[in-house]
Amino acid sequence: MTELFDKIKEITELDGIAGYEHKIRDFFRQKMTPFVDEVETDGLGGLFGIKHSKLERAPRVMVAAHMDEVGFMVSDIKEDGTLRAVAIGGWNPLVISSQRFTLYTRTEQAIPVISGSVPPHFLRGNNGGASLPKVEDIVFDGGFADKTEAESFGITPGDIIIPKSEAILTANQKNVISKAWDNRYGVLMVTELLQSLKNEQLDNTLIAGANVQEEVGLRGAQVSTTKFKPDIFLAVDCSPAGDVYDNQGKIGEGTLIRFYDPGHVMLKDMRDFLLTTAQEAGVKYQYYCAGGTDAGAAHLKNSGIPSTTIGVCARYIHSHQTLYAMDDFLQAQAFLQTIVKKLNRSTVDLIKNY
């Protein structure tokens, strides 16, 4: 597991929110290029490696992670030198206050900032209790004396603010705590998939990579599926674990078979294919029906694309400290590799046989 943790640490500590995925894209391009026939981007910056099949009428199978994590963008510099920001992606306001972040200026200068909070001493007039903060009311503080000093460091509206967090192992060495597993899980998964298939001749043309701007409305998936026109779309994404709250999604219990979420209902034949494949491969899996992934956008593009998500769950996602099991990654990895190898023309036609 040490080698896997090192890979996880490297990729989760990269910084990149929607619209600013360039660090992840550069890393991803370097990792995937040796294992594919060609690398292409879409008009928003999604990056995909293509392995061409030698077979006529080979189906086009798209495997897509997303590069972006949640963060913030500076909207205003106040006269006192603190910063207002808008959320890029979904945030629970309760997890934002008193956390360390990194602000990146236009010239890529990294500036440490913290998110503001109200100490209990200032709440005593309100019976000592704090009201629920609103995301838009939270300020970011870099210790600047005033607006002029903040601007002298190159800070302007539009600069990005990203959680500062180091990836660590839990005491039992089975789990990781980090930021951005949603969705660096997917980026690492696709990288490992392409490496494992380096010497394989597939019965499909594989288009594997990562979209941009998933966290702000599944935007990249709409562009990439239009460009690459897949017959089958497999999102690779991380979802919230509900095990602490007695809900679906338990860490350590394997990959997720997501038969429903508010943006996507899995087709019957796709569900049958996934269950049969998981059982034949001996993959540990669990059922899941929450959240949302790029499959929600992809399945509606072109004339309709059968889609699903190959995922894992993690506790406390969209925060500085997400906790997840490395074995779940390995189960999902085995599942995805088996799926991709099985998706030949007859299997794809069966899934699409209405």
Predicted regions and their residues:
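N-terminal hydrophobic/helix-forming segments and targeting peptides
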Residues: M1-Y354
